């Protein structure tokens, strides 16, 4: 039987705990340590070895009630998560303990820290993933096995858009999904669990939560916990996995909360100096290999709507598609409030999506860009000062802008409108008809919150 290696708590600084070990038992970086905190198990993760046989650790739960001199056990391994079929339909915390009041799984567990796949193992694919959301499919096509970021400030609809993607993709895709709730509202996690149960996608989904009420240690590691489950589905089962992370900014934020306590000098805007390294470690593991793919959708909170903030700016470089949510569009009552001019995808290329799709998408972007340029003239001089050509362009641009809106399935109970999914070919055809002037005699109001272009004609015919 292996000897139990024990140390003692030396200092407690909020979520950071120093533990002194005998020199021969000093744990390695990223090792999980365990102790009994008034009847409940507390897990610490070694972050630094600061000399004098002291391991500086980050707590995965509250440190209330800890005292100096308390015994700590070195588990001699990193934090591990249950993986495989046993986690489907279940809900876990950062250390792999169930939080759905069901028994703990007893099968295989994997460490949350592991190297990213090598270049030789990685696979590149340019298969389009249809979402049923018009603005996304037309202007920001998603790649199967790609990384997608949903950028937006507070209250512009990131979580609703992500839940809509879960609803549309998880239902049609038929593969397995992992949802990691990183530092977001517990209420939203609760709603998501019951919505998934109702729509019969829960048995194909694993959920991991480290919500905003939890200590920074849990919020810092929960994205890795969810990723570990997704990697196992990809590598051991050869599956195409969907990984949803809401919200990747909270991962960075949690790192900055403990960074100063760990004795690091802050860098730009007070973030941790290791920001790019930590983000890279996580993002490089979210990739497709020759065994299977991980398609990840990540919500990214943008502090004060500033896209140049180091946290969202660091995330940008890792993504294939960037969906930017705009408060100005949300204030017009148009949802999803996706900015067609700020959102980009590297798949919007005629060689990937085809010439017809590409040309319609470019024309939509051009007409909206010109409409934006004309806004100042309209505001000062009014529509009458525009040329006939520009007036026609403005009318069509408004119809295009309205037609980009769409009722969502997950917001049905708030809006009272049934959700709609639209096939890609119907989306392309609809925008082509607007741009070619086939809808010039229909009022722009009829283009709001509809699915196919045929619905617009029906709506207009009814109101004649």
UniProtKB/Swiss-Prot annotation:
It catalyses: ATP + H2O + 4 H(+)(in) = ADP + phosphate + 5 H(+)(out). ATP binds at residues 152-159. One of its GO terms (cellular component) is plasma membrane. Produces ATP from ADP in the presence of a proton gradient across the membrane. The catalytic sites are hosted primarily by the beta subunits. It comes from Ureaplasma parvum serovar 3 (strain ATCC 700970). It is a peripheral membrane protein. This is ATP synthase subunit beta. GO terms for molecular function: ATP binding; ATP hydrolysis activity; proton-transporting ATP synthase activity, rotational mechanism. The gene is atpD. It is found in: Cell membrane. It holds the Pfam family ATP-synt_VA_C. Keywords: ATP synthesis, ATP-binding, Cell membrane, CF(1), Hydrogen ion transport, Ion transport, Membrane, Nucleotide-binding, Translocase, Transport. SMART domains: AAA. The keyword Translocase applies. F-type ATPases have 2 components, CF(1) - the catalytic core - and CF(0) - the membrane proton channel. CF(1) has five subunits: alpha(3), beta(3), gamma(1), delta(1), epsilon(1). CF(0) has three main subunits: a(1), b(2) and c(9-12). The alpha and beta chains form an alternating ring which encloses part of the gamma chain. CF(1) is attached to CF(0) by a central stalk formed by the gamma and epsilon chains, while a peripheral stalk is formed by the delta and b chains. Its EC number is 7.1.2.2. Belongs to the ATPase alpha/beta chains family.
